[in-house]
Amino acid sequence: MIDAKTLRLVTQNGLQQFAQGFILDGIAALRTLLPYCAKEAIISVEAENLEKNYHYMLSFLRNGGSDEKRNDVQAKLQRQGVALLEQACRTIRISLDSDLYCNALNRLRDVYGGQDALLDKWNSLLTPEEAGDVQDDIFDLLWTSPFWTAEDTAFWYDFLMQQRDMVQQHLEGAIFLSLWEHYDAEKMQLLGLMAESDCRRTHITALCHLMLLRIRHKELVPLMPPLPKSILSRKEKKQIAQVQHELLLMLVSEKDMEKEMKEAEAITKELFSGKQPLNAQNIKDMISLRGRYLRNRLQRGLDINLSKIPLLHTCKYMRRVSHWFMPFDKTHPLFQSVMIDDKGREKENLSVLVDLIMDCDVDKLAMLYLVAHDKDFSKAVQQLDEQELPDNAGSVIPEYNLRFIMQDLYRFFGHSPLHAQLANPFREEVTLLDFPELATMFSIDDTVACSELLFELGHYKQVLAAIDDVISREGASASALLLKGRVMRERKKYAEAISCGRSAELLEPENLEVLHFLVECYAWLGRYEEELEYLQKLSDIMPDDKSLPRLIAATIDKVGRREEALDLFFKLDYEASPDDDGYDELTSSIADIALALDKLDIAERYTRKELDLSDGKKWEAHLRMGHIRLLRKHRTEAATPEVNTEVDFVKQKHPAEQNEDGNDWKDAIDSYEQFINCFVGQHVQEAGVAIAKFHESWGMLEGKGIKRADLLLIQDILQAAASGTLK
């Protein structure tokens, strides 16, 4: 008997062959499966007819026959081959009886015997709980249903139209799942009909499913039924782009959560290792970290609840596949059991909370189940309902939209009982932009919006392909050229990146993002004159931006006009307050430039100010103070006539006994040791790493007259002191 893995591989290969027009190769794959589904004689008969008809066609053409409809016949044979392959695959899969699909199918047969009995029960008088159970069974019936005829499509469309909207959406999910596992053109037709529903929620759910099925069965897209005309209207074309955007947002949400987890792990790792004590600052850091990421997710529309998934989705309620597609509303039995008190009244406070909670349906249902079946959750709910009713005036209740649909699907494909056996659209490299007939429905703004998310995910090749395609169709825009430039910069093609930025500037001369991008590019290349030019442009557009004058002053310093830079920094210092953001950087810049200009008094004054602002915790300031004091020592020695070149350190007086003017050497050593202690404490590094930082300054110090021999002595002093071997 064939195993499940081989079955999938043979089927997939055959589907690709039929879809690409290699009908003989597709038939060969089909013939491989026929011995394993011999009980379904109709499949073998239809497969034999398919092969005969194709050979008749080939022989006819070979012998000089002419048929203007030959391509139509060819496409029809392709569709027949695909259908037969999927039927054979499903038949063999059921015979293997090795997964939840088979279990659901067998359970329906055991309980109901057939479709008619199940639908009769659905139409009988049922309690809400009984109706929910039967609805789940109808979901399983549609999910595991065999391949449809046109009559089946008509029957189920009529059936769905008789149900209320929430039932339609739930059972629509079953058809989507059935199609995800085994492509069926007739079921695709039904989804197309549902996409034309007047109910917005039904419409966007079907639209989303139709788009994802194109990713799932990408090789079969040419053989799929055309999209409904309503979807191709100008307004609905926008929604196709939104489907892709929301899918990519989920991947960015995932990446953002991973980034948060790494940062949190770094904090907790230091706590658990004992390198940092648990104190108020640690707790504050953790809360601040969480708050920062939460604000970012809310602003960007990212999923804020991914971290709750392990808790919610392991509950018993989510073991039933149909529950992953269940729409949530207040008529749901779970809501009724939790939110309605013994007197039949709705618990107002908790109801307000459920209305406002930013959760997709899957999360809401799982949470309500836990509330109903977990004592701790129940206690928390009771306490909440006893609180004063919150004022929700002006609150915005989230609308069920594409974002929640995509969040539900992300959870299904990543955590449902079926996740291990299903192809995951969130792990596919293919996007809707890769389909030419769909890409043309993306406006240039839509394309850029999706491509920016692809850029964030590191899919640079796809970004370039999408941007080049849309520019060729609609012409360039500043945002498209800017994004292309960012890709070029990531690929270290700086000349091309700058070219894109300059072209974007021509289209929008005052586009701040473009100007900032060019500033960054020129700074990266060390082309400081051009960097300064674009900083000046930004300053002209944003005269109230306090950060730009500092950047301009720093860039003037980089081009070698240090006196001018220092004067500008002095002016900024005069206008600034120690409470201003970035004031410590301002003092640091003045100290650095003053040191470079050998204005040691100014450098020392601003370095002391920098240390005061940081409570002595800034290692860069301690390092600079060491340089200043060492240079003062050098100046003193240079101005004093040399009397005795023979130095006996043992016979010299203790440094503390020397006069005050002779302590620069010791003061320099003290500053360097404070630098090492501060650096090691902040970076959890060995002292050797800090000493290497000191070594990076040797070129500057030697250029100002400090002897390498003295620098070597200082380095040995620092190493010996750090190791504890120096008395």
Go through each PLM region and give its residues.
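Single-residue signature of alpha-solenoid repeat helices
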Residues: 26, 463, 497, 531, ...
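Alpha-solenoid helical-repeat scaffolds
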Residues: 339-508, 520
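Canonical positions in the second alpha-helix
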Residues: 470, 503-504, 537-538, 571-572, ...
